[in-house]
């Protein structure tokens, strides 16, 4: 059912009947349930090469093709894929991965910060201030989205067991990198955003 609004970005359709399915052209592809979806550029391809991963499929976009790797390691099989920059492209590729069988997806990468945070420390978002457009096509409009506490707890437990430092944060999602004005950054910081 469509939730209508004067501003199209705030409209939402809860009906999941897509015009084009995410696995269009790859209906027979069955990917592993576990997936690492990394915003790490060429490091993903480098790791896949070193791990002797196989390419299960190549996801084609108008700017770049993204190999979808299958890695076999320590008796486990998982999917590995580089995530594209930008919410629309990243969501499109993630939809494809999910439609082909990925159910447990962990994403990692780097980010900019608004406050003084230590480098080389994992940041675990607890909520996100939604200032981009893509998420509004997946969930009804709201200022924030809270991240699933069970998933967050599992990630934090794993990092604690491995003695890897981390910090929780509130993140600001935006599609306008060069429109992060001084005043807007200060405003977001006053709302508790640190990334």
Where are the regions that the model predicts?
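Accessory terminal and edge-of-domain segments that mediate assembly/interaction
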Residues: 1-104, 112-195
């Amino acid at each position: 059912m469509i939730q209508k609004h004067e501003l199209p970005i705030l409209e939402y359709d809860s009906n999941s009947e897509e015009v084009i399915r995410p696995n269009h052209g790859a209906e027979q592809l069955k990917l592993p349930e576990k997936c690492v979806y990394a915003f790490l550029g060429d490091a993903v391809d480098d790791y896949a090469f070193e791990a002797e991963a196989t390419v299960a499929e190549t996801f084609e976009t108008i700017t770049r093709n993204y190999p979808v790797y299958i890695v076999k390691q320590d008796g486990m099989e998982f999917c590995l894929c580089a995530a594209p920059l930008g919410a629309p492209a990243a969501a499109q590729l993630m939809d494809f991965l999910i439609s082909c069988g990925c159910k447990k997806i962990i994403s990692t990468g780097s980010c900019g910060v608004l406050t003084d945070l230590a480098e080389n420390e994992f940041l675990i978002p607890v909520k996100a201030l939604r200032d981009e457009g893509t998420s509004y096509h997946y969930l009804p409009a709201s200022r924030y989205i809270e991240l699933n506490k069970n998933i967050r707890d599992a990630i934090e437990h794993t990092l604690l067991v491995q003695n890897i430092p981390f910090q929780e944060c509130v993140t600001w999602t935006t599609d306008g990198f060069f429109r992060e004005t001084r005043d807007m950054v200060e405003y977001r910081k006053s709302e508790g955003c640190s990334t």
